[in-house]
A protein has these predicted regions:
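Interdomain hinge/lid region at the active-site interface
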Residues: 203-272
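Internal alpha-helical scaffold of NAD(P)-dependent oxidoreductase catalytic cores
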Residues: 133-219
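Rossmann-like NAD(P)-binding element
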Residues: 53-90
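NAD(P)+-binding Rossmann beta1-loop-alpha1 motif at the extreme N-terminus of oxidoreductases
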Residues: 1-58
Length: 290
């Protein structure tokens, strides 16, 4: 199976690496606007070759779009226009609603399978690609009834090869859930980093006092602004709703602190501890489905 990966950063590079090593693809062709990324991907063995998009699409069985959401809006319609009827197309973007609306009336819409592998790190570029990044994680497939069966099966086969468990929902549902479980955590990390940088003018003090808790909480602030700004833009309504809920909890905590209601704070912390049970059940489910 000739597989095209458009965008050779962390996610695209990791997909290319695993599909190549697991022999899911007979050939993995990379496409990237940045020539340095293309060269790095070749040098690292992530892809078999790097070409332009039009050339890559010749005889392609599967196209994986792994580029920033701002570029996705432009490139997905172009790929649908140029791809043969046999080519299956998926994207791995973090938002789905706006993209789904963009191509809903395209004559080749049924060749497209919107998806989102819920995996990643704060790093970017081909050198950030990781073997086994997706194993045991969840891939969300959206609006499956709008995709032709054989194209859906091809994308499902890809995620099987990546050892991911698959769940299905609408694009609208995806964007609401992603705002809470993914986008909000990145915003929290970005804002925490800015708060500390504003208040702690002496970088040495941050270095000396920061412990593991700070490092783990602020880790996502190292994520690419070029990737995340378009995500927030395209999912603005759901993200704003998530922020309203989050800020409400912050204000509730601040009020209890100001009024010295320590029992109320302890109750809030105990309730937050319930996330341990939720996360454990998620881990257990992943083990069962592997």
């Amino acid at each position: 199976m000739k597989t095209i990966v458009v965008g050779l950063g962390l996610i695209g590079g990791s997909i290319a690496l695993d599909l190549k090593e697991k022999k899911f693809a007979t050939e993995v062709v990379g496409v990237d606007l940045r020539s340095d990324h293309g060269k790095q991907a070749l040098d690292l063995g992530l892809v078999d070759q790097v070409t332009g998009l039009t050339q890559a699409l010749q005889g392609a069985d599967l196209v994986v779009l792994a580029i920033p959401m701002s570029a996705m809006n432009r490139l997905l319609p172009q790929i649908l226009n140029e791809a043969s009827e046999n080519t299956s197309i998926t994207d791995v973007g973090s938002t789905k609603g706006k993209l789904a609306q963009l191509v809903q009336d395209h004559p080749k819409r049924r060749q497209y399978v919107p998806s989102h592998p819920m995996a990643g790190t704060e790093n970017s570029g081909p050198q950030a690609a990781l073997r086994g990044l997706f194993a045991g994680k969840t891939a969300v497939i959206c609006d499956k009834d709008q995709s032709a069966g054989h194209h859906l099966k091809r994308v499902e086969a890809m995620y099987d090869a990546l050892e991911m468990r698959m769940i299905y929902m609408s694009s609208t549902e995806h964007d609401i859930h992603a705002a809470f479980v993914s986008h909000l955590s990145h915003i929290s990390s970005f804002v925490l980093a800015n708060t500390v940088l504003d208040m702690e003018k002496n970088v040495a003090t941050i270095f000396d006092l920061a412990g593991g808790g700070f490092e783990s909480t602020v880790r996502l602030a190292k994520s690419s602004p070029e990737m995340w700004t378009p995500i927030f833009e395209q999912n603005a309504d759901s993200v704003e709703h998530a922020l309203d809920a989050y800020i409400g909890h912050l204000k509730e905590f601040q009020s209890a602190l100001r009024e010295k209601k320590w029992d109320k704070i302890q109750t809030q912390l105990k309730r937050a501890n319930e996330i341990r049970r939720v996360l454990q059940s998620i881990d257990d489910k992943k083990k069962v489905t592997r």
